[in-house]
Amino acid sequence: CGFVAMEPQTSYVRAWVGDVDFNSWKYDKVASMRQPGSTFKLFVYASAFENDDNITPTTRYRDQLISLQVPDAQDPQRLVTWTPHNSGGYCTGANMPLKSAFAQSVNTIAVKLGQDTGIDNVIDMAHKMGIQSKLDATPSLALGSSDVNLLELVDAYCTAMNDGKQRRPILVTKILDRNGNVIYDCEKDEPAPKPVMKYKTAFYLQRLLRAGMQEPGGTTQALWEYIHFYDTELGGKTGTSSNHSDAWVV
């Protein structure tokens, strides 16, 4: 497993755990490229909120099958039908608020929302929020089909938690020479956090992340007990890649 802890307001990386035992694996899961699964849905919703003021967490979408024509993986010149399914294998048909669709990680709605807002806009938003890796402009991107690493994903989530202000991860805060003179100070030498989205977009994203823990059927409800132990607001998003190869919690 890999783990990153980062302060949203400062972008200071407080913990970086590449694996439970580096001597055995010698593989840094923080820097490795993996499919983020449903954790990528945050950028789909962010793009929708940012580019269409009529879309809010209470806007309703129906959980129903959607089929799209996409290039075949083996022969890009040939189109095939792609029909995404929910993790449970079926659609409920429910006309649900986006907040609930995000909390329950409904795949069909994420794909439809991605098509409505435009995949290119989703990519642009993801990059603005902190994703640096190349992203493929395909409908399946809404479900996290392009590889990213854990550090950039956490950094991008921190943008939402910092009210829409982005800053690259800070690993070193200060460097002194042997005489005690400051030769590097991150607060002076690194760019300050800059707004990359409207405040209301970040506010909506924060509400969505809380919904994953607080709404019935939310995918992060396993962390619910912590609400009673800490005087703070908690939220998050889970993600699982194909064949359960990777499991994420941000």
Name each model-derived stretch:
Residues T59, Q64, P139-L141, I170-T173:
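Extracytoplasmic/periplasmic beta-strand context in beta-sandwich domains
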Residues S47-F49:
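Short active-site loop/helix that positions an aromatic residue
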Residues N54-V122, Q166, R178-A211:
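Conserved catalytic neighborhood of penicillin-recognizing serine enzymes
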Residues N23-F43, T58-Y61, M96, S140:
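Short active-site loop at a secondary-structure junction
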Residues S38-T39, S105, D147:
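Catalytic nucleophile serine of serine hydrolases
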Residues C1-E7, Y12, W16-V17, F22-V30, ...:
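A penicillin-recognizing enzyme superfamily signal
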Residues D75-N86, T117-D155:
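Mid-domain, small-residue-enriched loop/turn segments at the edges of structured enzyme/sensor domains
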Residues N23-A31, N107-I109, S133-L141, D189-P191:
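Glycine- and acidic
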